[in-house]
Curated annotation (Swiss-Prot):
Function: Could be involved in the secretion of an unknown factor.
Gene3D superfamilies found in the cross-reference section: FHIPEP family, domain 1, FHIPEP family, domain 3, FHIPEP family, domain 4
Compartment(s) of residence: Cell inner membrane
GO cellular component, one term: plasma membrane
Main location: membrane
UniProt name for this protein: Probable translocation protein y4yR
InterPro entries found in the cross-reference section: FHIPEP_1 (IPR042194), FHIPEP_3 (IPR042193), FHIPEP_4 (IPR042196), FHIPEP_CS (IPR025505), T3SS_FHIPEP (IPR001712), T3SS_HrcV (IPR006302)
Signal peptide span: none
Region (Disordered): 675-697
Amino acid sequence: MANALRRFTEYAPANPDLMVALMLLLAVSMMVMPIPVMAVDALIGFNMGLAVLLLMAALYVSTPLDFSSLPGVILLSTVFRLALTVATTRLILAEGEAGSIIHTFGSFVISGNIVVGFVIFLVVTMVQFMVLAKGAERVAEVAARFTLDALPGKQMAIDAELRNGHIDADESRRRRAALEKESKLYGAMDGAMKFVKGDSIAGLVVICINMLGGISIGLLSKGMSFAQVLHHYTLLTIGDALISQIPALLLSITAATMVTRVTGASKLNLGEDIANQLTASTRALRLAACVLVAMGFVPGFPLPVFFMLAAVFAAASFVKGDVLDADKVDATTVTPAESQTPNVAAQPNPIGVFLAPSLTNAIDQVELRQHIARISQLVSADLGIIVPPIPVDVDQQLPESQFRIDVEGVPVEQDLINPAQLSLADDLKKIESSGIPFRHDPETHRIWVEQSHEPALKAAGIRHHSPSELLAMRVHATLTCHAPRLVGIQETRQLLGRMEQEYSDLVKEVLRTTPIPRIADVLRRLLGEGIPIRNTRLVLEALAEWSEREQNVALLTEHVRSGMKRQICHRYGRHGVLPAFVMERETEDVVRCAVRETAAGPYLALEDRQSEALLSQMRQVFSSTAPGQTRPIVLTSMDVRRFVRGFLTRNGIELAVLSYQDLASDFKIQPVGSIRLPPSNGTSGEPRSIRPSATTG
């Protein structure tokens, strides 16, 4: 016997699959074959031990996924317990005996009173059925539903983190497997709780069958008196019911513990999790101790008991307080070397405003920051980019009354601002008629008035700008000019992350063919020409269509512009009309022939006289537009458009250059002139500046 037991203990751990199969076969056998009384005692003990083991395992797992086999274990345990109930019922009815465990348990619980035993059984069964099983069933049902509903969002989040480089492919597969396992676990637990609930109902039915069957057999077959039959079979029936319901109760607690777990990042077991959260607030512990002390003074309550409990709560609060204080000291303690080490890795602000010390008191700092914040919101809404916070600091090195605007730590603008003057926004005639003294600056075309005349300006209804508003306007110009510098790989990732919430398939398709640095390059090129990227969907759709066919980023940007033609025309036109200077075909050929291909990329190399002629004409276009009028665009072919635009930008001329592919069908072109250059080998005649169009009248 000892050798057989030793061989079994060596064989079982190595073959758990066979042990499960053996357990199921044993359960089926118990339903159809008579079992010796000694074997029934052993199986009852095994059933109790298995229930206790499952409960302990559920208490000590860190996450429900660590015990994902629980639904299957519930099924096996329920089948085994029901088969054991069938076996004990057969023994009770056939032999009037069910083993020493059932007899002893029944005698102990009944304590000589049948009613007591029956009531205890009903209480245990109702607690299991109405409270534990029903509550756990509802939790499992809701958890399964919510887990399945959240599954697509979690999968998209994993895809986004993988694309953004936050996790690798192995981690992505691991997380996907965990998600799949979690969804299957909660779905299976939803069904497994039906086993637990049905088990408690079966216990009520079985006790009735055993009582009625036992009394009938005792009276009719064994010739026992009614009192003997009632005592004997009631003792065995209640003992059998309780010995079956207690493991079922433990299994209900196990299942309820698993489905009600809320796993945190620390991944503690249930006891540690509860202890940490209950003792997290020392104030709560001390208040509970005070309440217990007060309850001890209620007449009839045992004062020593409540005092002892209050002392335990108070001691726990003081111990926890000491631990928290020690943690705070450890967190705030740094070595002298650490405290004196400068933050050499600090990155400069993308955009910063610096004032001379004399301006800090002369300009309202709160008003200035409000104006800058409003300007940032306007630029963000106009261009579709995220404008970072713009700090306003003091630079002791700046001369008096000067300010400086830095972009990525490099000064891009530095000028003088007079805090005692206001800039007027109305026309000159209105100001002259008001009689308020002013000064006109012919270089900037601004009209200045001393700040002391501000009440008179308000009374006359003349619009004006304060020094803080003027400075905010300079910030606006800087933001618009340097918007491409605010869009990098990180900002592109954030933009795609926001788009993925609504257009997940589109983002996935774009990232399949286009790396993020390339997308960022396209966005910067668009912003560099003042094209907003608010409608990111159009940009991504054009990238998805053209990225595989066009590897050149500059040409890819041209195709993206074609996809945004309506937005481009709306930006430069008015009332569906685009005034345009058209570049003649011969001039386009001159530009086309002047493009030089190098390893660093193509560039435009016009002859000096051609450059001068083109600049002369463009400056006439630029200066011919009166204030308030729509500035004409320059219209040319797609292949030379970016070279013409780059040539103008390098020479300080901000004119929109559009290709024919940028024109939307619902906008009309109003030619106002043509642009013509002499051929590269031409020597005769002076170049004509601008040839007016015959349609302009």
